[in-house]
């Protein structure tokens, strides 16, 4: 019973983190769809705040043993790759 509860908590933690990551990904995709300036201070502020918050959530979940560190790193890495693609797309549009 205890191991079932732990597994349930782990699944919930991962689902919540993935939902938060999806929100950030949608923000990045909206920006990419409109290809507005990614250096916009408001956009950068919101994205930085969201990424920092998610990284703290991931760290907390890892420290509690709810997710593996590799899972958290993979989640954050995917978002960072999407952000990099946004900057590249904007740079290519400018040329």
From Swiss-Prot:
UniProt feature coiled coil, ranges? none
Name the UniProt record assigns to this protein: UPF0358 protein BC_3949
Q: Which family does it belong to?
A: Belongs to the UPF0358 family.
Which Pfam families does the record match to this protein? DUF1507
Question: What InterPro entries does the annotation carry?
Answer: UPF0358, UPF0358_sf
**May I ask which residue range the UniProt record assigns to the signal sequence?**
none
Its domain of life? Answer: Bacteria
């Amino acid at each position: 019973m205890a191991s079932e509860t732990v597994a349930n908590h782990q699944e919930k933690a991962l689902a919540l983190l993935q939902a938060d990551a999806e929100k950030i990904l949608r923000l990045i995709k909206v920006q990419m769809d409109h290809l507005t300036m990614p250096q916009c201070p408001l956009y950068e502020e919101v994205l930085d705040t969201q990424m920092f918050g998610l990284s703290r959530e991931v760290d907390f979940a890892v420290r509690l043993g709810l997710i593996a560190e590799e899972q958290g790193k993979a989640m954050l890495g995917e978002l960072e790759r999407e952000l990099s693609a946004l900057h590249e797309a904007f740079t290519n549009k400018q040329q």
